[in-house]
């Protein structure tokens, strides 16, 4: 059962969690970590998001990358690329929350040769997330999206860090999956992809059951 059976036709990011839209939880987290600018990839019922948050919120400037057709997780990044003004970009799924210091992640290893990075959490028996194997030096060795036969210790938490030029390697104007298409391709091409292991909280609201867990878990998250 998917989340829409509980929250109706609203965009997933506007699903109310602990008294506020889930996207507000994520934007407040970015603000607390001293981000000044955020780009929101919007498509389905984007007016609900744009009218709620406007052009600025929580001390951050907000820009909107509008999708007129489904572009997938990688296609959305390619569509947003012209709005990026920094050398590296932090990208997050709009339906998951991880209690790590995003500012520290954005600054970490800024001068190292990794082309991309992703946050990983222990698999802990999960069978519906992207399985990831990591080398001793922290580089990703295998990315096997939602294949439970992969004997990897970690799963993808849905937070990424890219050199901005990587976004322009994604095909433009069509639906492209980051997890199933681009990440495996980049590994096969010899790109350096770093795994950032996080042992803390990782939540998503993709199903009614997880949505209810998030209601309780995020009730105490700072809302100022």
Could you describe each region identified by the protein language model?
Residues 1, 138-139:
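Residue-level signal for well-ordered, solvent-exposed loop/turn and beta-edge residues enriched
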Residues 1-7, 13-14:
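N-proximal low-complexity "stem/linker" segments adjacent to membrane-targeting elements
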Residues 2, 16, 20-93, 102-104, ...:
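Conserved N-terminal catalytic core of the sugar/cofactor nucleotidyltransferase
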Residues 14, 132-134, 183, 195:
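A structural signal for short hydrophobic beta-strand segments in well-ordered beta-sheet cores
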Residues 23, 49, 80, 95, ...:
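Residue-level signal for inorganic ion chemistry
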Residues 35, 86, 113-114, 190-191:
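Short, high-confidence coil segments that cap the C-terminus of an alpha-helix
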Residues 89-90, 97, 103-110, 123-126, ...:
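Catalytic-core segments of class I nucleotidyltransferases/pyrophosphorylases
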Residues 112-122:
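A short, conserved acidic/glycine-rich loop-to-beta-strand motif
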């Amino acid at each position: 059962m998917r989340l829409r059976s509980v929250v109706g036709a609203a965009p997933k990011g506007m699903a109310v969690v602990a008294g506020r839209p889930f996207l507000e939880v994520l934007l407040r987290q970015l603000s607390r970590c001293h981000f000044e600018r955020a780009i929101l990839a919007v498509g389905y019922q984007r007016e609900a998001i744009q009218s709620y948050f406007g052009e600025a919120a929580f001390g951050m400037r907000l820009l909107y990358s509008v999708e007129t057709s489904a572009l997938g997780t990688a296609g959305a990044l390619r569509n947003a690329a012209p709005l990026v003004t920094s050398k590296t970009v932090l990208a997050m799924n709009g339906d998951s929350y991880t209690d790590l210091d995003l500012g520290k992640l954005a600054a970490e290893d800024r001068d190292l040769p990794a082309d991309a990075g992703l946050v990983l959490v222990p698999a802990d028996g999960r069978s519906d997330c992207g399985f990831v194997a990591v080398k001793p030096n922290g580089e990703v060795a295998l990315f096997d999206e939602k294949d439970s036969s992969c004997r990897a210790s970690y799963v993808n938490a849905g937070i990424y860090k890219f050199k901005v030029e990587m976004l322009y390697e994604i095909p433009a104007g069509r639906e492209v999956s980051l997890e199933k298409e681009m990440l495996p391709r980049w590994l096969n091409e010899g790109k350096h992809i770093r795994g950032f292991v996080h042992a803390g909280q990782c939540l998503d609201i993709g199903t009614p059951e997880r949505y209810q867990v998030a209601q309780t878990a995020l009730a105490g998250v700072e809302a100022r």
